[in-house]
Amino acid sequence: MTIYPNLKKIMTKTQSTDFFIACKESRIENNTNFYGCFYLGPFDESLSQTLANDLRRTLLSELTGLAITSIEIEGVLHKFSTLTGMKEPVLDLICNLQNIVLRKETISSTNMNYRATKKTYIGFLSVNGPRVIKAADLKLPAGLQCVDPNQYIATLAEDGFLNMKFNINEGKNYIKQKPYNLDVTTLKKRNILLQNFKNKIGLTALKNKQLMSTTMEGKPLLSNSDNLRFKKSFKRMLTSPNQSLKNKTSLGHDTVSNPIPLDAVFMPVTKINCIIEENNVYSDFSTDPSLEFSTHLVPSLTTQTNLRQESTHKFVNKANSLLQENNLFRSEKVYLPNIYIPEGEGDALSLKGVSPYSDFKTFLSTLNYNSLYQTSLFLNQSLGQNKLLPWQANTLFFDVTNFADSQSNDVNMNMDLAGDKTSVQKIHSTGISNTDAQLNKLSLTKIKSFLGSSDKLQNKTYQSFLQPKYASSNLRTLLTQRSLQKNQSVFMHSFLDDQAKHKELTSNTLRANKFQVMKTVVSIPPKTFKTNPINTFHNQSLTFEYARKF
């Protein structure tokens, strides 16, 4: 078994060289079974299937092979006969001969017409029983050999023998032989000619007999001694028949034979599978300069209102220590994949009705899932962890990242229960300036919904992307702004039960001190992805998996 380790390197070079062909695996399973796996590409999604079918048909039709096309067995007139001393009938013998795989030592050209044959080779087989006949017993011409010498042919008893001559041809595809059936018109012509010949012979014999009768003289009678001598010799012949005459008669009966044509299949490869595998080597990361973010890459955003001053300092100090330990936030530039929402699709981000849950299907259909996954993979590699196992899950879950406006770095966004207003408030009492609450991890769930906080703040209301009349261009602007600084803080948050959270937010004592959270949770149907970025050559169904401690 041979495995090529440089296959992945060859596949990754497709960004500089368009076309590639590589052998992934090649092995010999047994004498008549060979396995090979090749990669060819890249092609468009619609073109690959068409090309694979054409390639399969071309390979099967252009390959040449060797096959036995006819046999001649001593004492056999047709394929439904039987041989004395042989276990199998002639029909089973023919089937075993058709399964014999032959090969040529020299490579022959494929310059041949459809269903045509080349030079004919003649082979022989002469075996006496008792014996098991195999392919190694065949007497093949020079340059030809059996792929499997242990191929079974027949079994002979003690009194059995098999004398056979067979023809071998090289060709393409297959040949279906025509049976030797005599036409009815040919039989009628033969009968008519035979009757005329008999009548003519009888007439000439009658004329000759009449002529001979006029001129023929009678023979003299034998003497008594001659009659006795003839009687003794005739009696000896009846009691002990001539052995040579018997041998001649039996030899003439056994040597009767007739060539039997066989349906030959010349294809050395009987099965070719073309499997289409997707490999998104071109869509790893986008290099669009408009999507260049400076310094920070935050997967999620959490906003705050008025925190108690004594708890704020502890949390900010902890967040600053996390930022200093995070190598990702020390980088100067980070390139994000393109996340585009068409015009008019931003209305799906708003809540409708009283329920805090809303359908997120419209917004889900507009996202580039592969770009989101590549972003998560890039974050994972930057943090020095590898927790993402995309081929073992059936759901996708992520947070819609909101980059605040650079002109107001300490802006907090909140959403009311009815979904008609969104409160944005600047922090005044915390003593923290230029600080946004951000969450450096993926929040994951299988609930296909849009979840928002169920409270109303008595503060100034601003237009934001969560309102129904929001334009998608503004959301795209928010997603592409460079607004985060190196020393910004990350605030962790926890979700409470819906009823308990509602009570806390409506109470007078806790209203000014609670987090206002906007989370988006979506679910992706199974088998959305067909690419494994870690091992791109496994034909597996890929989706997102939970990234713990991201």
Curated annotation (Swiss-Prot):
State if Transcription is listed as a keyword: yes
E.C. designation(s): 2.7.7.6
A GO CC annotation recorded here is: DNA-directed RNA polymerase complex
The role this protein plays is: DNA-dependent RNA polymerase catalyzes the transcription of DNA into RNA using the four ribonucleoside triphosphates as substrates.
Chief location: plastid
Q: Which GO terms describe its molecular function?
A: DNA-directed RNA polymerase activity; protein dimerization activity
Q: Report if keyword Transferase is assigned.
A: yes
Subcellular localization, per the record? Answer: Plastid, Chloroplast
Q: What keywords are annotated for this sequence in UniProt?
A: Chloroplast, DNA-directed RNA polymerase, Nucleotidyltransferase, Plastid, Transcription, Transferase
From the broadest rank down, the organism's phylogenetic lineage runs: Eukaryota, Viridiplantae, Chlorophyta, core chlorophytes, Chlorophyceae
Q: Which family does it belong to?
A: Belongs to the RNA polymerase alpha chain family.
| Gene Ontology annotations of biological process type | DNA-templated transcription
Q: Which InterPro entries match?
A: DNA-dir_RNA_pol_insert, DNA-dir_RNA_pol_RpoA/D/Rpb3, RBP11-like, RNApol_insert_sf
Subunit annotation: In plastids the minimal PEP RNA polymerase catalytic core is composed of four subunits: alpha, beta, beta', and beta''. When a (nuclear-encoded) sigma factor is associated with the core the holoenzyme is formed, which can initiate transcription.
Q: In its UniProt entry, what is this protein called? A: DNA-directed RNA polymerase subunit alpha
The annotated region (Alpha N-terminal domain (alpha-NTD)) lies at 1-333
CDD domains, alphabetized: RNAP_alpha_NTD (cd06928)
Consequence recorded when altering S449T: In strain: CC-503
Region named Alpha C-terminal domain (alpha-CTD) = 378-550
Q: What is known of its domains?
A: The N-terminal domain is essential for RNAP assembly and basal transcription, whereas the C-terminal domain is involved in interaction with transcriptional regulators and with upstream promoter elements.
Q: Where is this region: Insert?
A: 185-258
Which reaction is recorded as catalysed by this protein? RNA(n) + a ribonucleoside 5'-triphosphate = RNA(n+1) + diphosphate
